[in-house]
């Protein structure tokens, strides 16, 4: 086991004889066989589980709210002619399985329920990120994954008990999910070499899109065949099954990992030798408040997640209402933008690291360029959606393109906090999550209000507002965004309240 002096000696040796480049080449050949890439894949699985639990209510709520079928419809099959056909009994059994409680929830109530996941998340990210940064993310993330998965199993019972209990359960579940989404970035402070930071974080982050894809693809089918409660039972169970995988395989520091090779450990440690990654107990709050580069990231987070949460919550509803798709087809069509986005997130991370490692573009140029691409093009596409609603193929093409291009932000402003203040990654990620969840609490509620006022022009107003918010955040980030470590984030500088 390496000690502090040993690590420093190794750094000195490699710095003097140039072996860092050799170690880098050896580790790069391993690709996804390296421990750090294996860690990214495990985090991808965790994000997959969390986002299936976030999205399952969005895909199930059209089945939970049945405003079109008359009350007597479940008994309509009794009017059929009597037959001994096996197909008839199979169909009857299928309809019986699909029968589940339907609730009389207005669009406003649905918007509140969909937003409730974020209501309890305003204060949780900051302490979660701070604790993960100081004590390590292993147990913070693992506990959050288990709590969120366990509570998912009880959503059908909460819905039967009443809207209030369902909202409370989703609030608690949102707090647990914040522990996962916030704490995981503290791991990359000690595991991600600067030249691989974008690809490792995007591989892990792509689990969010992959989870959304799977739950949208399978959710509608599950609702139609065995009933909407099983959407929560199945994906909650998957999350619980992931927990035993997390605890024995995850370590906060590569120095302590029992399976990592000496070459990979040396490469990671030496790559981060010039970067102050030691967690800071004392927070330079006053300097953070005055930091325009930090505010640029905060504003960008709020604006980009405004659009993200709107799309995530209302894509199934838009497809089912505007395209008149049934529940199964709505789930399949809603899944397409997310699977393409999952692929593009990883490709964007690889491209960003390629441009940086080959010194084609500076880091700040990469961050701003990828953010601009990920904001401008999707905004234009979404604003154009109401004018192509008569064409189903064009509508789906626009939705897929919007999701694919917006994924470039994951290698832009959304990862920029790792560049400017690695010492305070956990705390800053928690602070950023607060802004993201504020957007997540407001945007679906606002969308539900617009849609309830006018179903046709309501969607147009939703897309116009989302585009305006997104572009305003981009302008602020382009003006004030930076990628160098800030003075207040260096060990020598401490400013206290």
Curated annotation (Swiss-Prot):
PROSITE patterns documented for this protein: MFS (PS50850)
Glycan attachment positions: 47, 56, 66, 75, 90
Membrane topology summary: Multi-pass membrane protein
GO cellular component, one term: apical plasma membrane
Catalytic activity: 3 Na(+)(out) + phosphate(out) = 3 Na(+)(in) + phosphate(in); urate(out) + n chloride(in) = urate(in) + n chloride(out); L-thyroxine(out) = L-thyroxine(in); 3,3',5-triiodo-L-thyronine(out) = 3,3',5-triiodo-L-thyronine(in)
Membrane-crossing residue ranges in chain numbering: 149-169, 171-191, 203-223, 230-250, 292-312, 332-352, 368-388, 398-418, 431-451, 461-481
MF term (GO), any: urate transmembrane transporter activity
Entries under Pfam families matching the protein: MFS_1 (PF07690)
Keywords tagged on the record: Cell membrane, Glycoprotein, Ion transport, Membrane, Sodium, Sodium transport, Symport, Transmembrane, Transmembrane helix, Transport
Compartments, as annotated in UniProt: Apical cell membrane
UniProt GO BP: phosphate-containing compound metabolic process; sodium ion transport; sodium-dependent phosphate transport
Tissue spec: Abundantly expressed in pancreas, liver, colon and small intestine, less in kidney. Not detected in the adrenal glands, brain, placenta, heart, testis, skeletal muscle, and lungs.
InterPro entries, per the entry: MFS, MFS_dom, MFS_Na/Anion_cotransporter, MFS_trans_sf
Family the UniProt entry places it in: Belongs to the major facilitator superfamily. Sodium/anion cotransporter family.
Protein role: Acts as a membrane potential-dependent organic anion transporter, the transport requires a low concentration of chloride ions. Mediates chloride-dependent transport of urate. Mediates sodium-independent high affinity transport of thyroid hormones including L-thyroxine (T4) and 3,3',5-triiodo-L-thyronine (T3). Can actively transport inorganic phosphate into cells via Na(+) cotransport.
Protein name: Probable small intestine urate exporter
């Amino acid at each position: 086991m390496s000690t502090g002096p040993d690590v420093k000696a190794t750094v000195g040796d490699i710095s003097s004889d140039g072996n860092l480049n050799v170690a880098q080449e050896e580790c790069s050949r391993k690709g996804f066989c390296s421990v750090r890439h294996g860690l990214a894949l495990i985090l991808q699985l965790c994000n997959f589980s969390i986002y299936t639990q976030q999205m399952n209510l969005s895909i199930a709520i059209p089945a939970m709210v049945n405003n079109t079928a008359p009350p007597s419809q479940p008994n309509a099959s009794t009017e059929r002619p009597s037959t001994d056909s096996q197909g008839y009994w199979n169909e009857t059994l299928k309809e019986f399985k699909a029968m589940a409680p339907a609730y009389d929830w207005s669009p406003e109530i649905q918007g509140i329920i969909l937003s409730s996941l974020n209501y309890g998340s305003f204060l949780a990210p900051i302490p979660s990120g701070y604790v993960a940064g100081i004590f390590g993310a292993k147990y913070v993330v693992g506990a959050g994954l288990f709590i969120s998965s366990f509570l998912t199993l009880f959503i059908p019972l909460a819905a039967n008990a009443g809207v209030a209990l369902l909202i409370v359960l989703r609030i608690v579940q949102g707090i647990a999910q914040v522990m996962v989404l916030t704490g995981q970035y503290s791991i990359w402070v000690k595991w991600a070499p600067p030249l691989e930071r974008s690809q490792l974080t995007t591989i892990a982050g792509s689990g969010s899109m992959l989870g959304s894809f799977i739950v949208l693809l399978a959710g509608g089918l599950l609702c139609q065949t065995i009933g909407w409660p099983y959407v929560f039972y199945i994906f909650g169970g998957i999350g619980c099954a992931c927990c035993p995988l997390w605890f024995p395989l995850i370590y906060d520091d590569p120095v302590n990992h029992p399976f990592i090779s000496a070459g990979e450990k040396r490469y990671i440690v030496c790559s981060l030798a010039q970067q102050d990654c030691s967690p800071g107990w004392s927070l330079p709050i006053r300097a953070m408040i005055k930091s325009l580069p930090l505010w640029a990231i905060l504003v960008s987070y709020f604006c980009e997640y405004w659009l993200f949460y709107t799309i995530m919550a209302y894509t199934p509803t838009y497809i089912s209402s505007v395209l008149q798709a049934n529940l199964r087809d709505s789930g399949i069509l809603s899944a397409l933008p997310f699977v393409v986005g999952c692929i593009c997130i990883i490709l964007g991370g690889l491209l960003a690291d390629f441009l940086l490692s080959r010194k084609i573009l500076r880091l700040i140029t990469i961050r701003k360029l990828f953010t601009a691409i990920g904001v401008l093009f999707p905004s234009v596409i979404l604003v154009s959606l109401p004018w192509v609603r008569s064409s189903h193929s064009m509508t789906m093409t626009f939705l897929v393109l919007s999701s694919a291009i917006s994924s470039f932000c994951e290698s832009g402003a959304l990862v920029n906090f790792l560049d400017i203040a690695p010492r305070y990654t956990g705390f800053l990620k928690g602070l950023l999550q607060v802004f993201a969840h504020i957007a997540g609490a407001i945007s679906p509620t606002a969308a539900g209000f617009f849609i309830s006022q006018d179903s046709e022009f309501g969607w147009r107003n939703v897309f116009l507002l989302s585009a305006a918010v997104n572009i305003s955040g981009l302008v602020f980030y382009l003006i004030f965004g930076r990628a160098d470590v800030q003075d207040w984030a260096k060990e020598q500088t401490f400013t206290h309240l």
